[in-house]
């Protein structure tokens, strides 16, 4: 994915798909998820978390991408016969938000283990 640069409200810089490539990247994501599900490439939770993470990276909207991506990840998990994720539950309200952002950044670097684990924290 050819990534653009965006600076968040908190001053953190992150990469996202350039605006003109968002539809293409969303289609690639749809195709990848269909392949993963059809071929059992990953366990259901990992498929849903990978989907969530890629959607965050694509960043299709000016704001609300994290919330939308978590909701979409939950819906995918449910469609795969899993319970919705907790995403750290109540901890997201306080210091857990930083844990979530750190887990997303680790996933940005290829380490999805922390984000997968956080998704199921009660």
Residue ranges and their predicted role:
Residues 1-122:
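FIC/Doc superfamily catalytic core
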């Amino acid at each position: 994915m050819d990534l653009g640069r965006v600076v968040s409200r908190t001053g953190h810089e992150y990469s996202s798909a350039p605006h003109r490539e968002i539809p293409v990247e969303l289609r690639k994501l749809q195709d990848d998820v269909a392949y993963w599900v059809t071929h059992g490439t990953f366990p259901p939770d990992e498929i849903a978390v990978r989907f969530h993470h890629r959607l965050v990276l694509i960043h299709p909207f000016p704001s609300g991408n994290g919330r939308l991506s978590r909701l979409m990840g939950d819906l995918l998990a449910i469609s795969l016969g899993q319970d919705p994720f907790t995403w750290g539950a109540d901890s997201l309200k306080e210091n857990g938000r930083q844990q979530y952002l750190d887990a997303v950044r680790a996933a940005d670097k290829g380490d999805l283990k922390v984000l997968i684990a956080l998704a199921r924290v009660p």
